Amino acid sequence: MGNFPAPKNDLILRAAKGEKVERPPCWIMRQAGRYLPEYHEVKNNRDFFQTCRDAEIASEITIQPVRRYRGLIDAAIIFSDILVIPQAMGMRVEMLEGKGPHFPEPLRNPEDLQTVLDYKVDVLKELDWAFKAITMTRIKLDGEVPLFGFCGGPWTLMVYMTEGGGSRLFRFAKQWINMYPELSHKLLQKITDVAVEFLSQQVVAGAQILQVFESWGGELSSVDFDEFSLPYLRQIAERVPKRLQELGIMEQIPMIVFAKGSWYALDKLCCSGFDVVSLDWSWDPREAVKINKNRVTLQGNLDPGVMYGSKEVITKKVKQMIEAFGGGKSRYIVNFGHGTHPFMDPDVIKFFLEECHRIGSK
């Protein structure tokens, strides 16, 4: 993995591997981004994907929360987006201010799909900027905290590629899996193949831990999740370590899966090959701990909306959460149940992190 500085804080790596820790490690999904004033200063008037593709700027944005919350955050996550995989597969993606992602030419029929299936993806070439940003960030961090790489889950990426953006009804994605199940599997397989290579090359570039965001997992029924999501998540968990060995990386790289809303699948996710399963806030942690039976590390799961509450409420909710996950000295990573919001107060986030340290160290 190159001549990178040795980690000074490996708390999250140890927790992910199931080792005992002094306190639960803390990081937050979307910890780098729009709620930080320094993000807006650096991004300036650049387009979102233009920002991601500038390695120097992406690296700076990645490090901003680590710098602001020095000693409180136990990992950095590279500033990027799950939709870079569809881009690498030849699809055009725009990020519309205030509206979110938009695909001008979504996949709506078998002919559209064939174009994507026939497209030869060169991951190293298409996503070269991402690997440069990771390497640059890993060097700049100087071992202060480990660096996350990530990608979107295959089903979630298929949703965006077929819907043309976010959705409430999931009309087109559901149409695909119900009208063209075989073609849907072909698309999911191609996305999976690209995801495996992308994640593996992120590790080569310097990522020390990986997360797969299956953000739309909860939009599938349990039966459809078992057919259109879980097998591809399992493939990723199984194939990435093998690909890393082919690339000369023998050390264990912890992998996290976050299938938001997929409450019915927790037992299966705990034996899917991932080291960590991340939970959204709909879960009662005590129930999740029972179902898990100590097989994997659990991550989560504070409702991000708690950040709009008083300090007393934040303290109470953090205490409840850490205690419900067993105290945090083993098999637990503190996080939100989803990402930060643009409207959050950075000082409130700091208080949350301080309370996680204070309560988790007891």
Curated annotation (Swiss-Prot):
The lineage of its organism: Eukaryota, Fungi, Dikarya, Ascomycota, Saccharomycotina. InterPro entries: UROD/MetE-like_sf, Uroporphyrinogen_deCO2ase_HemE, Uroporphyrinogen_deCOase. Changing residue 107 to S: In HEM12-3 and HEM12-13. It catalyses: uroporphyrinogen III + 4 H(+) = coproporphyrinogen III + 4 CO2; uroporphyrinogen I + 4 H(+) = coproporphyrinogen I + 4 CO2. Its EC number is 4.1.1.37. The record marks 81 as: Transition state stabilizer. This is Uroporphyrinogen decarboxylase. One of its GO terms (molecular function) is uroporphyrinogen decarboxylase activity. It comes from Saccharomyces cerevisiae (strain ATCC 204508 / S288c). Optimum pH is 5.7. GO terms for biological process: heme biosynthetic process; protoporphyrinogen IX biosynthetic process. One of its GO terms (cellular component) is cytosol. Pathway: Porphyrin-containing compound metabolism; protoporphyrin-IX biosynthesis; coproporphyrinogen-III from 5-aminolevulinate: step 4/4. Present with 9220 molecules/cell in log phase SD medium. Catalyzes the sequential decarboxylation of four acetate groups of uroporphyrinogen-III (octacarboxyporphyrin) to yield coproporphyrinogen-III (tetracarboxyporphyrin) with the formation of intermediate hepta-, hexa- and penta-carboxylate porphyrinogens in the heme biosynthesis pathway. Acts on a number of porphyrinogens, but only coproporphyrinogen III can ultimately be converted to heme. Belongs to the uroporphyrinogen decarboxylase family. The keyword Membrane does not apply. Changing residue 215 to N: In HEM12-2 and HEM12-11. Pfam families: URO-D. It comes from the Eukaryota. Coproporphyrinogen III binds at residues 30, 32, 34, 81, 160, 215, 338.
